[in-house]
Amino acid sequence: MPELPEVETTKQGIKPHLEGCMITSVQVRNQKLRLPVPLNLNELCEGKHITAITRRGKYILLHMDKGYLLIHLGMSGHLRIVSQTANPQKHDHVDLHINNGLALRFRDPRRFGLFIYIDENPYQHPLLAHLGPEPLSDDFNSEYLLRKAANKSQSIKSFIMDSQIVVGIGNIYAAESLFLAKIHPNTSAKKITTEEFNSLTGHIKKILESAIEAGGTTLRDFYSSDGKPGYFRFALKVYGRKNLPCLVCENKIETVVIAGRHSAFCPHCQPIIT
């Protein structure tokens, strides 16, 4: 699933082509996504100008002079800027035609994504209203995490992947951040010290910033708006490296299942706290 860096990379890629432009038409080829694409989306959007493009967690928001489009890439989705004459492929579900001859094309083979219209304040929509702070904001810091972790017996990895605690951190960047902070992923959140939270928040911010600069991480499905893969996969220290030697101590990378997800870690660099 695309995480914050991949969504931010996508937002940055489409922004120069869409902001300030007018939507001339919308073509919906398949409305059956996680939530149905509105059948009258063309009527809702035609003739409106895109005034801004922002990101909230893993969601992309297209602000129009009236209303908003809320987009989520799901497990396998991506957005491309294409010519309006470009032939659609099998999983190209929605085209947003712009008055500059280009189109925003939404592709989603597994159809877990979203492409919906919101009339009112989008930040009060149920999908956004309860999200935690952005990890690259000043609101996300060790004091905040320490306060939220009080009496939380869940694993620290599940804790930082909870979008109500902090948005945008999925399996890849949680594993990498915990490795750099030398924290075992199964450690109870309430046992993490202030010093460890200082280290963890710092590494989360640095990793996300580095991943954005690298265009995200492409392991299978993710491609940016210009069709290029993300290159942060070459910087991964533990994710996807089970049984390979740790790049720090040369012990074998192991995995443990936490909340149904395989979590990579180094047993030497990240000892469990009992």
UniProtKB/Swiss-Prot annotation:
Family: Belongs to the FPG family.
Necessary cofactors: Zn(2+)
Pfam family, one: zf-FPG_IleRS
Name under which the protein is recorded: Formamidopyrimidine-DNA glycosylase
Listed SMART domains: Fapy_DNA_glyco, H2TH
E.C. number(s) listed in UniProt: 3.2.2.23, 4.2.99.18
Manner of cofactor binding, per the entry note: Binds 1 zinc ion per subunit.
GO biological process: base-excision repair
Active-site residues, Swiss-Prot/TrEMBL: 2-3, 58, 261
Keyword Metal-binding assigned: yes
Native species: Legionella pneumophila (strain Lens)
Residues given in the record as DNA binding sites: 91, 110, 152
Alphabetical keyword list: DNA damage, DNA repair, DNA-binding, Glycosidase, Hydrolase, Lyase, Metal-binding, Multifunctional enzyme, Zinc, Zinc-finger
Function as written in the Swiss-Prot or TrEMBL entry: Involved in base excision repair of DNA damaged by oxidation or by mutagenic agents. Acts as a DNA glycosylase that recognizes and removes damaged bases. Has a preference for oxidized purines, such as 7,8-dihydro-8-oxoguanine (8-oxoG). Has AP (apurinic/apyrimidinic) lyase activity and introduces nicks in the DNA strand. Cleaves the DNA backbone by beta-delta elimination to generate a single-strand break at the site of the removed base with both 3'- and 5'-phosphates.
HAMAP family documented for this protein: Fapy_DNA_glycosyl
Complexes and interactors: Monomer.
FPG-type zinc finger segments: 237-271
